[in-house]
Curated annotation (Swiss-Prot):
The lineage of its organism: Eukaryota, Fungi, Dikarya, Ascomycota, Saccharomycotina. Belongs to the protein prenyltransferase subunit alpha family. Keywords: Prenyltransferase, Repeat, Transferase. PFTA repeats lie at residues 44-78, 84-118, 123-157, 163-197, 207-241. Catalyzes the transfer of a geranyl-geranyl moiety from geranyl-geranyl pyrophosphate to proteins having the C-terminal -XCC or -XCXC, where both cysteines may become modified. Acts on YPT1 and SEC4. It catalyses: geranylgeranyl diphosphate + L-cysteinyl-[protein] = S-geranylgeranyl-L-cysteinyl-[protein] + diphosphate. This is Geranylgeranyl transferase type-2 subunit alpha. Pfam families: PPTA.
Length: 327
């Protein structure tokens, strides 16, 4: 790192570090053996719980110890009051801050909430606020988004009220903040599907037109980001869109989208001298749909595949295979 003085490791310092490392390893192995022995002996006590805390702070990915911890808590549940459960949530949060992508921590937190002595909406609404803060720190954390869906589902179940529209707006905020947030796009897919299935969309055609405008804007914002293109591919092929729009409306949407993609690709060529790989890939998808609908006046698939061979040589064999199929 620039500006940071490199530490000079003398033989004595290396020896001291080796001694310290050996002690840490010994202590960890001793603690692990101790806790596993207590588990095997089915010791379910507060002291055993403390030992699991100590071990999980050293290794939060030790799933067997999380399982043992839950067994202890379940055994002592009748003696445990709300302050204990609050402290347990604090303990888990402390670990999540340092290890936000360890599944077992998220899993345990969910278990604690499900076994919390009261099932009031406030508990889950507070948890939603906690998830919001965690996603502010790492907006693309897959575990955080998955956990959020579970929390929202519990709030909806308790209150008997859908939060789909609020969650849709939340994805918009997150995507606007960072268009490459794949997790937010993925969440958007699920919410739109659910809203249509549950009849939560009033003017469905207008909703789709608004969404396609949002997509086009996203393409122009960052044409290199694959998250946008994955979403586009889902959107144009989804039954929700195909069945809501009539044939002419659907074809017009596809052709308008194609014109915008061609414009983006031409801008890319003018700016960098290179084709945009994602533009070419989605143009192929669009051509396949238009050809299937017998609405393709001029076929350019072979041209796009030849251009992809040049622009994306790592996948050359795939494009050659597709080129053979198109001949």
């Amino acid at each position: 790192m620039h500006g940071i003085k490199r530490k000079q490791w003398t033989k004595e310092l290396l020896r001291q570090k080796r001694v310290q490392d050996e002690k840490k390893i010994y202590d960890y192995r001793s603690l692990t053996e101790n806790v596993l022995n207590m588990r095997d002996e089915k010791i379910y006590s507060i002291e055993a719980l403390k030992k699991t805390s100590e071990l999980l702070e050293k290794n939060p990915e030790f799933n067997a110890i999380w399982n043992y911890r839950r067994d202890i808590i379940a055994s002592l549940a009748s003696e445990l009051e709300i302050p204990f459960w609050d402290k347990e949530l604090v303990f888990v949060m402390m670990l999540l801050k340092d290890y936000p992508k360890v599944y077992w921590i998220w899993n345990h937190r969910l278990w604690v909430l499900k076994h919390y002595p009261t099932s009031s909406p406030k508990v889950w609404q507070t948890e939603l606020a906690v998830v919001n803060k965690l996603l502010e720190q790492d907006a693309r954390n897959y575990h955080g988004w998955h956990y959020r869906r579970i929390v929202v589902g519990n709030i909806e179940s308790i209150t008997n009220k859908s939060l789909d529209k609020e969650e849709f707006e939340y994805t918009t905020i997150k995507i606007n903040n960072n268009i490459s947030n794949y997790s937010a796009w993925h969440q958007r897919v699920q919410i739109i599907s659910r809203m249509f299935q549950k009849g939560e969309v009033g003017n469905q055609k207008e909703y789709i037109r608004t969404e396609i405008s949002y997509i086009i804007n996203a393409m122009f914002t960052d044409a290199e980001d694959q998250s946008v293109w994955f979403y586009i591919k889902w959107f144009i092929k989804n039954d929700i869109v195909c069945k809501t729009l009539d044939e002419q409306e659907y074809l017009k949407m596809l052709k308008d989208l194609r014109e915008n993609i061609l414009l983006i690709n031409n801008d890319e060529i003018e700016f960098s001298g290179k084709q945009n790989i994602w533009c070419l890939k989605i143009l192929l998808v669009l051509e396949d749909i238009l050809e299937e609908k017998e609405a393709l006046t001029e076929r350019s698939s072979e041209q796009y595949l030849v251009q992809l061979i040049d622009a994306d040589p790592l996948r050359k064999n795939r494009y050659l295979h597709l080129l053979e199929q198109h001949k």
